[in-house]
From Swiss-Prot:
Enzyme class label: oxidoreductase
Cofactor notes: Binds 1 FAD per subunit.
Annotated source species: Thermus thermophilus (strain ATCC 27634 / DSM 579 / HB8)
Source taxonomy: Bacteria, Thermotogati, Deinococcota, Deinococci, Thermales
Protein name: Ferredoxin--NADP reductase
InterPro entries per record: FAD/NAD-bd_sf (IPR036188), FAD/NAD-binding_dom (IPR023753), Fd--NADP_Rdtase_type_2 (IPR022890), Ferredoxin-NADP_redctase_2 (IPR050097)
Keyword NADP: yes
Catalyzed reactions: 2 reduced [2Fe-2S]-[ferredoxin] + NADP(+) + H(+) = 2 oxidized [2Fe-2S]-[ferredoxin] + NADPH
EC numbers on record: 1.18.1.2
Required cofactor(s): FAD
Family: Belongs to the ferredoxin--NADP reductase type 2 family.
Residue numbers binding FAD: 16, 35, 43, 48, 88, 122, 287, 328
Amino acid sequence: MAADHTDVLIVGAGPTGLFAGFYVGMRGLSFRFVDPLPEPGGQLTALYPEKYIYDVAGFPKVYAKDLVKGLVEQVAPFNPVYSLGERAETLEREGDLFKVTTSQGNAYTAKAVIIAAGVGAFEPRRIGAPGEREFEGRGVYYAVKSKAEFQGKRVLIVGGGDSAVDWALNLLDTARRITLIHRRPQFRAHEASVKELMKAHEEGRLEVLTPYELRRVEGDERVRWAVVFHNQTQEELALEVDAVLILAGYITKLGPLANWGLALEKNKIKVDTTMATSIPGVYACGDIVTYPGKLPLIVLGFGEAAIAANHAAAYANPALKVNPGHSSEKAAPGT
């Protein structure tokens, strides 16, 4: 086979894709990751590497970047091939093989394909306030890549979901002052997080303003002011700030995957209980899939990855059983 061939090709090198690769490797098959981001980890690396994750079994809490580091180390003994900075564009059938071409013009073949592309292509949801785009990268942020960026700064956080509430709490030990505004009195974040947020507000460790929205951002070479307003009375407040963190969610889309001939439902890939898609030999797992009872949780993504990987392995090599046996009875390479 040519050097661009592996037994299994995995579209996506986020946490679910990495764990799928681990299981493919445990079955003795070769595999390649194709991902448009420059490094593994998906959203965990690109959007919130220093955010704690609390719902991974065995970890009371773990930084996103540390979870990715562990997953990369876990899969490393199986010699994965990484094709990073490449977006999977097309999927074609060539005899018994699948051929995936990428945005870099490369073509990779495999006996089976696993799609673990997370939410698909994503970009931050901008709110359209005057000065927002002007100061992007100069005080306006849509993600926290490093908490150190906010050390000693006066930070305005805009949003009412998990990311906004979690970062308001996570930056308490870093920022000089935190103000969180949300356009509604109710928050969409997890109840326990909201309770902790309001406790911090009552204790004077941060300020919460509802129902407030961002009117405009002002400054010179960097952000200096943010004008917010009460959306019922229109009363304005001018806040001296060093950073505006807009966490209003992300706009997601399947991108080229939408043209692969897969059965879709509400911009998600439909799978059965084996994580098989409507195309034989193509499996999917993680946030990109839908099935009755599906929940978008990382811990479920890991389980789906194991199912997809073992069925893909058996498809790629019919001599293999789907059931992999217990990992405790085996030893990974290098152990």
